[in-house]
Amino acid sequence: MSNEIHLFTYCLILILQLISAVSNTFILTLFYRISGLSSNKHLRLILYLTISDFLFTICELPYTIYITANWNPYVFNFDPRFMLISSIPLPAQLKISAILTISIALNRNIALIYPGVYLRINQQNYANVTAVIAVAFAVFDVILCFTFSDYEPKPGCGSAGCFVGDEFRYYWGISNTILGFIIVLLSFTIFLKLNHQKNSVLRKSSNDARFRQANRISIGILVSSLIFLTTPSIFVGVFEICGFSAFKLVGPFYAASLLFSGICNATIFIANNGDARRIMTKKTTTSFFYNNNNNNNTNLNT
């Protein structure tokens, strides 16, 4: 039964990768074509998160295709070096996504609690520094992963997580659990502040449509992260610390969680952005009338 669970996970990841690639490509195209989005300093962190989701989706494809194509109903016997190299995007994106999410949550906390300080912060520099820190931690995780990896074959192992050493899994579990708790804490303070908002200075600054839009998108992304990243990270971290490996049970489920999170982030952005909704509505309407005209012409010809 375990091998069938792995196969289901592999197929699910392939489907999610297709959806994630399309949705994040659409958002990146919007940022490129609409000057109001690219110049919106409040959305810079959202842009970086979208870029990381897109790159993860594309770079993880060789790994997903390999494990799906070489699935065996009886015994797995994957090449350890290919598994480790092709799975590099997973630990990197998990750390990047967590740090960017923490930065988004911290930024919203500052905006809600200390609006005067928030207005003095250069949002572009804040986002750029966050991106550099996130990439640095991701590189550190990848180096540790290869340092403590076991390059020996692991018959019956259906995930790259089985090839990394116990030291890295222990570190990974603790670090991701800590980051998860930070996200929970910052998110809780945001929700609490929104329910008891009495700051007249913030209400005045909140009249800015760009600020309100960034607020809605950020809160939506935090909820998505809590569901698809933080909760799994905490549970997996506890399991790893206790000596149990979830990788051996359900395969690369972390990749599925990251993809779910990326798709939800894209959906939240589109739902809260008027330009994105107008473009999608326009394309849908145009496609509908185009198909109707083709059908009418076909009926007239017959």
How would you name each of these model-derived features?
Residues M1-T302:
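Seven-transmembrane-like multi-pass membrane architecture, highlighting hydrophobic TM helices
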